[in-house]
Each structure stands twice: as structure tokens, then as C-alpha cells.
From Swiss-Prot:
Any single Gene Ontology cellular-component annotation: cytosol
Binding site for NADP(+): 166-168, 232
Name recorded for this polypeptide: Bifunctional protein FolD
Entry-linked Gene3D superfamilies: Leucine Dehydrogenase, chain A, domain 1, NAD(P)-binding Rossmann-like Domain
GO biological process, one term: purine nucleotide biosynthetic process
Transmembrane segments: none
Keywords: Amino-acid biosynthesis, Histidine biosynthesis, Hydrolase, Methionine biosynthesis, Multifunctional enzyme, NADP, One-carbon metabolism, Oxidoreductase, Purine biosynthesis
Pathway as given in its UniProt record: One-carbon metabolism; tetrahydrofolate interconversion
NCBIfam families assigned to the protein according to its UniProt record, in alphabetical order: PRK10792.1, PRK14186.1
Family annotation (InterPro entries): Aminoacid_DH-like_N_sf, NAD(P)-bd_dom_sf, THF_DH/CycHdrlase, THF_DH/CycHdrlase_cat_dom, THF_DH/CycHdrlase_CS, THF_DH/CycHdrlase_NAD-bd_dom
PROSITE patterns: THF_DHG_CYH_1, THF_DHG_CYH_2
Family affiliation: Belongs to the tetrahydrofolate dehydrogenase/cyclohydrolase family.
Length: 282
């Protein structure tokens, strides 16, 4: 059987169109425009592309983006001072600091300094803690986007065995909490996991977020599994995921492509989080 493609490109367009309608409605009522501050430290080419996509999406939905492009030499205290200003700015609803940061800046200290109500990336320990307590508000964008993609399949996740490959703070760990919240039985694998293949073969739902091209053989995929590939890698000038796509697509019921799968959803959920923060910014 050939897997059905879960298109993040299409779903993200629908989500952004709905957000744009809501924002237009607020502005017609005489309310201010939602505001997102985007901070980029240094000139990492990949980060510049990601930030550019986020700013473009802001324009598409009607969010005012305020840009801070800072030099590589920016100190931690200088960045903290900017965050202090943005935390106090009533016209800014969301604050996004593009990761990774230069080595002289402690990313955890920066994330913890952002007002949790403006943490639209969903990385602040307070927001991760709320998800852990089953009362989520601002949720990590990539896992949140994956949950929206899974919803489109119509599959009931209760009791399904979900296997996550990768245990990062940005994807793997919050992803495990999202899937637990949805009623799945969750296994998280990581670099110390023995016999990765055995775990993958048992997955009804497989989410891979490592950043190693074709790490997961298509032969390992369980028949009729739902396969979500979060990885994005450049190989011979082409973008590929962490999963051997063609072979996996022969066995899976549903699969996300790379590009055009999870990536667009991450940005769409950032826009969604920004509107949520705006609506709750009292």
C-alpha cells in the first residue's frame, strides 16, 4: 500500500487563513495589531532563513513583527536588557529568540528570562510544566504542529503505541507530553537507547526528530503506521528527512514529506501562539 501524504503546507495555509480572519476582526473592532518581537543574534544562514519565514508569516496573517538583528558579539546582559524592555512593552505579545545562540550566551537563562505569557516558542519551564500538568497554554510549536497533523488523519490516539526518536527539549520531550495528553502509550528513544530498530518496529505512531539523514530505515516501519518526520537535512543539494521516505511510504498508512510536512506547521503554530498570547495579554 502507498501511504497518504500529510501535507503541512496545506494545513498551515488553512490555519494562517483562520488566524488572519480573526486578526482582521479584532482590528475592525478598533483593537491594536498583535505584536511579535523576533530576535536574531549573529548571522547563521539557517537561522536567517528561519527568521525570514517567521517574519513573512507575520505579514501574511496581520501580525506586526518587530525585528532585532544583533551582532554575533552581543553579550548575555545586552540580550537580557532587550528582553526586559520587551517584557514590559504592552504592544508586544510574543517574544521569540532564534536558537542556537552564540557560545557566550546561556540559552536556558535567556528562555527563562522571557515572560512566560509572551513565550510563544513554548520553551519556558513554566509552559512546559503546564503541559506536564495537563493544563497547556503556550505549547512548543513543533510538537503542537505535529499534533495538528495527526488530527487530520482522524486516528484515535488513545492506546496507540507512539515512539519518539530523539529527546531534545525543543521536540522530543514536549512531544512525549503532547502524545501522553492525547492518550497514547509513549516510548522515547535517545542516543543511549539500545536496539533502536526494535522500538521503531513497534510504533503505531512514529515521530523522528534527530537531524541525521535516513537514520530510520523504511524496512523498520510497522504496517499501517503513521510516520512523522521532523528532521530536515541537506544532502547533495536536496532537503531530506531522518526517515528513508520512499520505502517507509510503501508500508505506512500516513507519512509527512520533507520539505512540506512539519516545517510549515511549526511556523503556523508560532502565529497561533502569538494570537493566543495577544488574546490573553491583559
Amino acid at each position: 500500500m502507498a501511504a497518504k501524504i500529510i501535507s503541512g503546507t496545506e494545513l498551515s495555509k488553512q490555519i494562517k487563513a483562520n488566524l488572519a480572519d480573526k486578526i482582521t476582526h479584532y482590528i475592525e473592532q478598533g483593537k491594536r495589531v498583535p505584536g511579535l518581537a523576533v530576535i536574531l543574534v549573529g548571522a547563521d544562514p539557517a537561522s536567517q532563513i528561519y527568521v525570514g519565514n517567521k517574519r513573512k508569516s507575520c505579514e501574511e496573517v496581520g501580525i506586526l513583527s518587530k525585528s532585532y538583528d544583533l551582532p554575533e558579539t552581543t553579550t548575555q546582559n545586552e540580550l537580557l536588557a532587550i528582553i526586559d524592555q520587551l517584557n514590559a512593552d504592552k504592544n508586544i505579545d510574543g517574544i521569540l529568540v532564534q536558537l542556537p545562540l552564540p557560545k557566550q550566551i546561556n540559552a536556558e537563562a535567556i528562555i527563562e528570562h522571557i515572560d512566560p505569557k509572551k513565550d510563544v516558542d513554548g520553551f519556558h519551564p513554566y509552559n512546559v510544566g503546564r503541559l506536564c500538568q495537563r493544563i497547556p497554554t503556550l505549547r512548543a510549536c513543533t510538537p503542537y504542529g505535529v499534533m495538528k497533523l495527526l488530527e487530520t488523519t482522524g486516528i484515535d490516539l488513545h492506546g496507540k503505541h507512539a515512539v519518539i526518536v530523539g529527546a531534545s527539549n525543543i521536540v522530543g520531550r514536549p512531544m512525549s507530553l503532547e502524545l501522553l495528553l492525547a492518550g497514547a502509550t509513549v516510548t522515547v528513544t535517545h542516543r543511549f537507547t539500545k536496539n533502536l530498530e526494535n522500538h521503531v518496529r513497534q510504533a503505531d505512531i512514529l515521530v523522528v526528530a534527530v537531524g541525521k539523514p535516513n537514520l530510520i530505515s523504511g524496512d523498520w516501519i510497522k504496517e499501517s503506521a503513521v510516520v512523522i518526520d521532523v528532521g530536515i537535512n541537506r544532502v547533495d543539494g536536496k532537503l531530506v528527512g531522518d526517515i528513508e521516505f520512499d520505502k517507509a511510504a510503501e508500508k505506512a498508512a500516513y507519512i509527512t514529506p520533507v520539505p512540506g510536512g512539519v516545517g510549515p506547521m511549526t511556523v503556523a503554530m508560532l502565529m497561533s501562539n502569538t494570537l493566543y498570547a495577544y488574546e490573553h495579554n491583559k
